[in-house]
Design a protein with these regions (language model features):
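A detector for small-residue-rich transmembrane helices and their helix-helix packing motifs
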Residues: 1-174
Length: 174
């Protein structure tokens, strides 16, 4: 995924930013493609670098539970972040970047220990809070050029992923 993000940003830079139009456009039917595309698109290399570092670090921590786990968390967080942004962000705005996924990874790591009742996972969650806590709270503050909606719904998606993917989950009787 990271290679795709970087490859697309190189193409986007050469093309004068023309790929950014495929981001999330709230409540516009054409903007729904951005739900999947937005995490791969960035507003320049600075934006991409800012997302790449936590994406890789937290993604690797999640991947300790296997490739399928990181793919499942990524899918859930991407959908919740993207659809939430599409539903509530202001009209005539464009939302791009992987920060919704980054926020989702963080809250997944923070909350999974509680759902799994696992001391090691709780410790990992505490480390995430200590390292990224200020950025998480700051990213929820409305600010021009920042998709706080993507951050908020990404964070919600991380908690949803931790709940849905918890260990020992038994199916409900039919």
């Amino acid at each position: 995924m990271v290679a795709l993000m970087w490859g697309l940003e190189v193409v986007d830079a050469i093309a004068g930013g023309s790929l950014d139009q495929y981001g999330i456009e709230p409540r516009d039917d054409d903007g729904l493609t951005g739900v999947v595309a937005a995490p791969f698109l960035h507003a320049g290399f600075g934006h991409l670098i800012a997302n790449t570092i936590p994406f890789v670090v937290m993604g690797l921590v999640i991947a300790f539970n296997g490739a399928m786990r990181v793919l499942a968390v990524t899918a859930i967080v991407t959908l919740v972040s993207g659809l939430g942004t599409w539903l509530v962000a202001p009209d005539f705005t464009l939302h791009i970047g992987a920060s919704g996924v980054v926020f989702g990874y963080a809250t997944y790591l923070i909350s999974r220990g509680a759902f799994n009742r696992d001391a090691l996972e709780l410790a990992v969650g505490l480390i995430v809070v200590l390292v990224w806590g200020t950025a998480l709270l700051g990213g929820l503050r409305p600010e021009d050029g920042i998709s706080w909606q993507g951050h908020l719904f990404g964070a919600i998606g991380g908690v949803v992923a931790a709940r849905v993917l918890r260990r020992g989950r038994t199916p409900a009787p039919v």
